[in-house]
Amino acid sequence: MKNWKKWMIAGSIICIAAGFLLIGIGSSMGGWKNIDKINSRYIHFGDSDTFIGLNFPANTTESQQILSRETDSPVDVGSDSSGEVISFNGKLPEKMEISASTLALKIVPGKSDAIILGGSNRDKMNCYIKDDCLYLEEKNHKPIQKGGEIVLTVPESMDWKKIEIDAEAAYVALQDFSAEEMEFSAGAGSIEASGLQTKKLILSVEAGAITLTDSEAAELEADAEAGAIHFSGSITDMVDADAELGNIVLKLSQSKDDFDYEIDSDLGNVEFDGISVENSVICNKASGKMNLDSSMGNIEIYFEQD
């Protein structure tokens, strides 16, 4: 790895550490805002083929009329403690894009045909649908309530083409989702998931961490600059792993003989079942392939069938 890139990574880590220090100072001086009420937003899918949305940006063609009313009893799409309900008719989104800076977010599948956004910090997020994509974005410069978790519930029957999550300094958790493609990135934050199924899985960390368990993918791209990536499950076709200064650990349900290998350990380390492997090309005439590059980092692969 080139020297300028090493200095860039080191500088990024220093800046991130300084940012956390400033956040801590602000918190200790009373910078947290208490929220008296927890409001949830509901999106209900009907038979119409129009777009749907929640907190749409102003003046967009996809904006729909907000139906808000006070109620003492349950309504079709649900009610919360404040009695505020927002209902839209429309088509299901095909993509989901999540961008979280500092909050704690959980994404779960639900049995109803509604998208529900709840939690004490719900008003710190913009949530809307545009061009068949569900967007959830953290607002800038908003005080957050300590310990407040945001929960995004989406219908479990939804057929996702792509799920993209960016956790800058946030914590994001999800479980039991499938999509054609998934792309997760963690700056200084963390992403935890289990029960994922996808054709293509892209994982990248700077100084953060991504942990996936009991998951399946045909292709995996993993890039760890200075953070950590942990994956357990099965990869059937292709693994492309690059550990610059970071750590990548794969626990695969297959055998070592199920893959061909191109290994470049450089100044780092590559291990199969705890045994170091030097720079080499290994041909098993297998259907799966691995390209492993541990520039100055560490790559560990464990095979359950060996």
Each language-model region and where it sits:
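Short, Lys/Arg-rich N-terminal segment immediately upstream of the first membrane anchor
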Residues: 1-8
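Hydrophobic membrane-insertion alpha-helices, especially the h-region
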Residues: 10-25
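Short linear S-[DN]-x-LW-Φ motif typified by the pepsin-like aspartic protease active-site region
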Residues: 25-137, 145, 149-164, 171-177, ...
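Structural recognition of beta-strand segments within beta-rich domains
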Residues: 98-100, 204, 243
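Residue-level signal for short, function-critical loop segments
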Residues: 102, 169, 188, 207, ...
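Short, surface-exposed interaction patches in beta-rich subdomains
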Residues: 139, 193-196, 200-202, 209-306
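Acidic/histidine-rich helix-loop elements
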Residues: 142
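Right-handed parallel beta-helix
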Residues: 164-213
